UniProtKB/Swiss-Prot annotation:
Family: Belongs to the class-I aminoacyl-tRNA synthetase family. MetG type 1 subfamily.
Keyword match Heme: no
Cystine bridges: none
Domain tRNA-binding: residue ranges: 575-677
Protein name: Methionine--tRNA ligase
PROSITE patterns xrefs: AA_TRNA_LIGASE_I, TRBD
PANTHER family in UniProt: METHIONINE--TRNA LIGASE (PTHR45765), METHIONINE--TRNA LIGASE, CYTOPLASMIC (PTHR45765:SF1)
Function comment: Is required not only for elongation of protein synthesis but also for the initiation of all mRNA translation through initiator tRNA(fMet) aminoacylation.
Catalytic reaction(s) noted: tRNA(Met) + L-methionine + ATP = L-methionyl-tRNA(Met) + AMP + diphosphate
GO CC entries: cytosol
Quaternary state and interactors: Homodimer.
Length: 677
C-alpha cells in the first residue's frame, strides 16, 4: 500500500551530562531508533536528533570536585555519550548540546516573547542559602531529618524511607550537601512562567486523543489540583545561560533543556546549509510531525511546561509524547552492589548491540509499562528467536544453494501461496511498528518464522538432496526457504541493523519493505557465513562481575570501620519497623559458668524481666560496674535456647570485638521499657 511521505522530527530525552549512559537510558533510545528506522524504510523524511542536557548546579559542583571547568566536563561527557549511542546503532542525524550558541539564542528568544506577551511574572521568594559557599541551595542539595518519620540524612524534597514529600525548609536540622554548613533563609527576586494562563489550551490538547491514555489521565489529575506558576530562574553561581537584562540570574535548567531539541535541529539545518527547514518544522502552523520519546518521570515538564512555553512564544506544539516506563533487572531496581547497574559501554564489551535491541523491542508496547531485563530469559530468548528461528532458516538452505547451484536461486517459488501468506502480513506488522506495539510485531514475526521452519522440516531438503533427479525440487525448496528468511529479516531490519547488514551481504540484495512483494528468483547469493552466534550464561556472569568491578574502581576508598565491616544491603522501612528496640535497666550482671565469652544479664523492661546472654565478657572482665546501667535491647527477638539457659533478647553494642566492645546506653532521662525510635 503506497504511503504519502511525511516530514517527521523525532527526539529522545536529553541525557544529563554528569554521568555515563546505562541500560535504563538505552530503553528509550532503542525504542525511538526502531521506530525511526521503520519510518525511514517506509519512505518518510525523518530527522532524528538528541543532545546532552549540560546545565545546572550538579554539573557545576561535579566539575569543581574534578578540578576542571564545566565546559571541559560536558565536552568529555558528550564524546562518551555519542560513542555509546553509536555502539548501539542509534541512528541520530545530529547530537548536540544545550550549552550551545543555538540554544542560547533560542532560549533568549522564547523568554523574550513570553515576557512581551505577559507570561513572565516577578516576585520575591525565600530560599535556603549556604553561607559558606555563597549560593542558594536546590532541594537536592539540602539534607536533614525527615519531618514526618524522623529518618536522618534525607533530601530536601522527599524522604526515601517513608516516601513523604515536603519543602526543604521543613527539614529538621538541615545541612548543605555542598559544604556541610547550616543553611540560612535569604530572600531573592525570581522570575516565574505563568503556567495557569495556559490551562484551557492544555486541557484541549489533553482531550485531543493524541496522548497516551495514561498520560492524559495523569494530566487531568494535575488540572484538578490546579496549575501553579513555574520558577524559571536561578541565582548565581550557576552554570547555564544568564537571563537577558537580569545580572546574576540564570535560566533554570528545565527551561533551556527542552529548547535543546530546537537547538539541535537548528544546528543540523545550519550544517546542511538548509535555511528553510527549521521554520517549516517549528512554525505555529507546521504540518510536520514532532514526537518526543521520554520516560514517565519527566512527563510533567513535557506535557505542561513545554507545550505552554511553545504556545506562549508562537511556536508549534508537539504532535505527541511517546512515554515509556522504567527498566528493572532480574525483577528489581538496578543495583550497583549486585552488578545489575550496567553501563552501555560495559554491555558492549560482552554482548553485541542487536541482542539488547531485540530483547527490549520484544517487550515494548505503546503503554507506559516497566520493562524487566531478566538476564536468564534474555539468553534463552535471543538464542531461541534470533539463532534458532531466523538465522537457522538461512543456514539450513544456503549450503545447498551454494554447493549444488553455484549460489543461484531457482527461477520459480516452490510454494507461491505460502509466500503470499508472508507478504500479506506486512500490513499488520507495519501497523504494529508504526503504533509502537513492538512486542506484537515480534510475536507475529516469530510465529511466521515457525511456519517457515516447519516448511523446511516437512520438505526435508537434506533428504531431497540425496534423491536422484530431484535437483530442481531441491533448488526450489531452498529458494523458498531463503525468500522467507529475506522477508523475516526485512521486518526485523529496524530492530537488528547489524544482523540485517550481514543478511544483505549474504543475499546480495538490500532489505527493502516494498521489495519483498517480488521474491528473489534466478538471483545469485553470496557464500553463506555464520550470521549470528549463540550467547551463553557465562557471558552474563562476566558482565555482572565487570559491572561490580567498575563500581569498586570508581567508588571512593572506604577506610576505618566501614572497610572492615561494610554496611549491609538496604532494607525497607517496614522491615526496620519490625525490630522493637527498648530501653532496659541492667539489674544484675554475672559470669556464665563454662563460658569465657558470655555474661548473663538480668534486664528490667519497666515491669517485665528478661534473661539475656551476651558475648561481651572480653570487654567487661568485671561485670559489676554494669549493674544499674541503662542499655538498649532487641525486645522482640525470638527466645534462643542455649546450653546455659534461654536467652530472651539481645543487647546492643558497637565495636569490632575483643576488648573493643562498647555497650550502648541512652542519654539520661530515658526510662526502662521506652521504645527506641
Amino acid at each position: 500500500m503506497t504511503q504519502v511521505a511525511k516530514k517527521i522530527l523525532v527526539t529522545c530525552a536529553l541525557p544529563y551530562a554528569n554521568g555515563s549512559i546505562h541500560l535504563g537510558h538505552m530503553l528509550e533510545h532503542i525504542q525511538a531508533d526502531v521506530w525511526v528506522r521503520y519510518q525511514r524504510m517506509r519512505g518518510h523524511e525523518v530527522n532524528f536528533i538528541c543532545a546532552d542536557d549540560a546545565h545546572g548546579t550538579p554539573i557545576m559542583l561535579k566539575a569543581q570536585q574534578l578540578g576542571i571547568t564545566p565546559e571541559q566536563m560536558i565536552g568529555e561527557m558528550s564524546q562518551e555519550h555519542q560513542t555509546d549511542f553509536a555502539g548501539f546503532d542509534i541512528s541520530y542525524d545530529n547530537y548536540h548540546s544545550t550549552h550551545s550558541d543555538e540554544n542560547r539564542e533560542l532560549s533568549e528568544l522564547i523568554y523574550t516573547r513570553l515576557k512581551e506577551n505577559g507570561f513572565i511574572k516577578n516576585r520575591t521568594i525565600s530560599q535556603l542559602y549556604d553561607p559558606e559557599k555563597g549560593m542558594f541551595l536546590p532541594d537536592r542539595f539540602v539534607k536533614g531529618t525527615c519531618p514526618k518519620c524522623k529518618s536522618p540524612d534525607q533530601y530536601g524534597d522527599n524522604c526515601e524511607v517513608c516516601g513523604a514529600t515536603y519543602s526543604p525548609t521543613e527539614l529538621i536540622d538541615p545541612k548543605s550537601v555542598v559544604s556541610g554548613a547550616t543553611p540560612v533563609m535569604r530572600d531573592s527576586e525570581h522570575f516565574f512562567f505563568d503556567l495557569p494562563s495556559f490551562s484551557e489550551m492544555l486541557q484541549a490538547w489533553t482531550r485531543s486523543g493524541a496522548l497516551q491514555e495514561q498520560v492524559a489521565n495523569k494530566m487531568q489529575e494535575w488540572f484538578e489540583s490546579g496549575l501553579q506558576q513555574w520558577d524559571i530562574s536561578r541565582d548565581a553561581p550557576y552554570f547555564g545561560f544568564e537571563i537577558p537584562n537580569a545580572p546574576g540570574k540564570y535560566f533554570y535548567v528545565w527551561l533551556d533543556a527542552p529548547i535543546g531539541y530546537m537547538g539541535s535541529f537548528k544546528n543540523l539545518c545550519d550544517k546542511r546549509g538548509d535555511t528553510t527547514s527549521f521554520d517549516e518544522y517549528w512554525k505555529k502552523d507546521s504540518t510536520a510531525e514532532l514526537y518526543h520519546f521520554i520516560g514517565k518521570d519527566i512527563v510533567y515538564f513535557h506535557s505542561l511546561f513545554w507545550p505552554a512555553m511553545l504556545e506562549g512564544s508562537n511556536f508549534r506544539k508537539p504532535t505527541n509524547l511517546f512515554v515509556h516506563g522504567y527498566v528493572t533487572v532480574n525483577g528489581a531496581k538496578m543495583s550497583k552492589s549486585r552488578g545489575t547497574f550496567i553501563k552501555a559501554s560495559t554491555w558492549l564489551n560482552h554482548f553485541d548491540a542487536d541482542s539488547l535491541r531485540y530483547y527490549y523491542t520484544a517487550k515494548l508496547s505503546s503503554r507506559i509499562d516497566d520493562i524487566d531485563l531478566n538476564l536468564e530469559d534474555f539468553v534463552q530468548r535471543v538464542n531461541a528467536d534470533i539463532v534458532n528461528k531466523v538465522v537457522n532458516l538461512a543456514s539450513r538452505n544456503a549450503g545447498f544453494i551454494s554447493k549444488r547451484f553455484d549460489g543461484v536461486l531457482a527461477a520459480e517459488l516452490a510454494d507461491p501461496a505460502l509466500y503470499k501468506t508472508f507478504t500479506d502480513a506486512a500490513e499488520s506488522i507495519g501497523e504494529a511498528w508504526d503504533s509502537r506495539e513492538f512486542g506484537k510485531a515480534i510475536r507475529e514475526i516469530m510465529a511466521l518464522a515457525d511456519v517457515a521452519n516447519r516448511y523446511v522440516d516437512e520438505q526435508a531438503p537434506w533428504v531431497v538432496a540425496k534423491q536422484e533427479g530431484r535437483d530442481a525440487d531441491l533448488q526450489a525448496i531452498c529458494t523458498m526457504g531463503l525468500n522467507m528468511f529475506r522477508v523475516l529479516m526485512t521486518w526485523l531490519k529496524p530492530v537488528l541493523p547489524q544482523l540485517a547488514a550481514r543478511a544483505e551481504a549474504f543475499l546480495n540484495s538490500e532489505l527493502s519493505w516494498d521489495a519483498i512483494q517480488q521474491p528473489l528468483l534466478a538471483h545469485k547469493v553470496n557464500p553463506f557465513k555464520a550470521l549470528y552466534n549463540r550467547i551463553e550464561m557465562k557471558q552474563v556472569e562476566a558482565l555482572v562481575e565487570a559491572s561490580k568491578e567498575e563500581v569498586k574502581a570508581t567508588a571512593a576508598p572506604v577506610t576505618g570501620p566501614l572497610a572492615d565491616d561494610p554496611i549491609q544491603e538496604t532494607i525497607t522501612f517496614d522491615d526496620f519497623a519490625k525490630v522493637d528496640l527498648r530501653v532496659a535497666l541492667i539489674e544484675n550482671a554475672e559470669f556464665v559458668e563454662g563460658s569465657d565469652k558470655l555474661l548473663r544479664l538480668t534486664l528490667d523492661l519497666g515491669g517485665e524481666k528478661r534473661n539475656v546472654f551476651s558475648g561481651i565478657r572480653s570487654a567487661y572482665p568485671d561485670p559489676q560496674p554494669l549493674i544499674g546501667r541503662l542499655t538498649v535491647m532487641v525486645a522482640n527477638l525470638a527466645p534462643r535456647k542455649m546450653r546455659f539457659g534461654i536467652s530472651e533478647g539481645m543487647v546492643m553494642a558497637a565495636g569490632p570485638g575483643g576488648k573493643d566492645i562498647f555497650l550502648l546506653s541512652p542519654d539520661d532521662g530515658a526510662k526502662p521499657g521506652q521504645q527506641v525510635k
